[in-house]
Design a protein with these regions (language model features):
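Cysteine-nucleophile protease catalytic domains, especially the papain-like/related folds used
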Residues: 2-66
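Residue-level marker of positions within ordered structural domains that often coincide
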Residues: 37, 75, 114
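Noncatalytic regulatory segments and standalone regulatory/sensor domains
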Residues: 63, 81-154
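Short, hydrophobic/aromatic-rich beta-strand segments within well-structured domains
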Residues: 68-71, 108
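Generic short beta-strand segments
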Residues: 71-77
Length: 154
């Protein structure tokens, strides 16, 4: 229990959460960069890539075994709208079944093919339809808030 509390406090020092707002992507990138500097890790993080480059950047990060943090941002510019992005689970027959909807949530991309991103959310495996993600971003959100934390070598 003590180590868990210690870990939580350490994380809070790098990643402060803004009450009622959460953590915007730029604040996540700033916390990761602070962690890299303190640990003398020769990497740099920034939030956001051009929409047309997102799939290439995700692929490159996965190939280099760099964690890909994907923000499925809130509705933008009006965050209290209720539009969400579907997460899918893959059944034993290899078909994708709708599981739950998300917005204003970070997930970790662990794999990608032509149609789906394999993601982890709270330790569970899901899939995001790549075209549905683009549609969500373009119609209900924005690449300003729905994007990746791009990590690369300095």
């Amino acid at each position: 229990l003590f180590r868990s509390l210690e870990c939580t406090e350490t994380m809070r020092s790098y990643f402060p959460v803004i009450p009622f707002f959460g953590m915007p992507g730029w604040l996540l990138a700033a916390g990761i960069n602070r962690y890299f500097r303190c640990g003398r890790i020769p990497l740099k993080a920034s939030f956001g890539v051009l929409g047309r480059n997102i799939w290439n950047r995700i692929s490159a990060m996965l190939v280099h075994d760099i964690p890909v943090i994907l923000a499925v941002g809130p509705n933008f510019p009006i965050p209290h709208k209720r539009h969400k992005l579907m997460l899918y689970e893959k059944n034993g027959r290899g078909t994708y079944q709708p599981s739950m909807e998300i917005s204003a949530h970070f997930v970790t991309v662990t794999g990608m093919d032509e149609n789906y991103m394999k993601v982890s959310s709270w330790g569970r495996e899901y899939y995001i339809d790549r075209q549905e993600f683009l549609n969500y971003v373009r119609k209900y959100s924005s690449f300003l808030v729905s994007n990746i934390c791009y990590i690369r070598k300095k």
